[in-house]
Amino acid sequence: MKEVAVYQIPVLSPSGRRELAADLPAEINPHLLWEVVRWQLAKRRRGTASTKTRGEVAYSGRKIWPQKHTGRARHGDIGAPIFVGGGVVFGPKPRDYSYTLPKKVRKKGLAMAVADRAREGKLLLVEAFAGVERQDQAIPAWAKEAGLDGSESVLLVTGNELVRRAARNLPWVVTLAPEGLNVYDIVRTERLVMDLDAWEVFQNRIGGEA
């Protein structure tokens, strides 16, 4: 089975469009992507959910009525789980949900996520954001010219903070710094747009995993 394929990725430059050849995974493993996304979301969980046991609820430990001769079912204190307002059995306690995922799996997952966008024709590289910096109103015009009309959600990855801040005003755009590129944000958006500096950072991150 062929592991690497050559993808022709469109590059948008001030002088027009060209193509860049890139080596990326030929096969996309959905389960591996799921594993990486699950790992990411587990790391983000706060893990603060907490319930009280019968020993922690604010009730007396006194037996509510005698064991015998009342004609009623036998019970202990009112904090027992069987009563409304009583303690919870096996309820959640604060915990750390994060776990370790091999670095090789994470790198391969990132390469596959980008390759999937390239295979779908939904990966666009940008040579420069000329005239867009410091002009919020210039971003929509640039996006329209690049073929991004807002009908699909876009992940914009660039090291240019001014461009990221301007693009955040568009509700269908998610912005990230190159170092923050991750599988979850790629798969939850429909298109991926990166400048060439971000592309270089991505290539360095995946190393030989493509």
UniProtKB/Swiss-Prot annotation:
Pfam family, one: Ribosomal_L4
GO cellular component: ribonucleoprotein complex; ribosome
Domain of life of the organism encoding this protein: Bacteria
Keywords, sorted A to Z: Ribonucleoprotein, Ribosomal protein, RNA-binding, rRNA-binding
GO BP field: translation
Alphabetical list of Gene3D superfamilies matching this protein: 3.40.1370.10
Keyword Manganese: no
Transmembrane segments: none
GO molecular function (one): rRNA binding
Family: Belongs to the universal ribosomal protein uL4 family.
HAMAP family (UniProt xref): Ribosomal_uL4_B (MF_01328_B)
Assembly mode: Part of the 50S ribosomal subunit.
Role noted for this protein: One of the primary rRNA binding proteins, this protein initially binds near the 5'-end of the 23S rRNA. It is important during the early stages of 50S assembly. It makes multiple contacts with different domains of the 23S rRNA in the assembled 50S subunit and ribosome.
Protein name: Large ribosomal subunit protein uL4
Name of the encoding gene: rplD
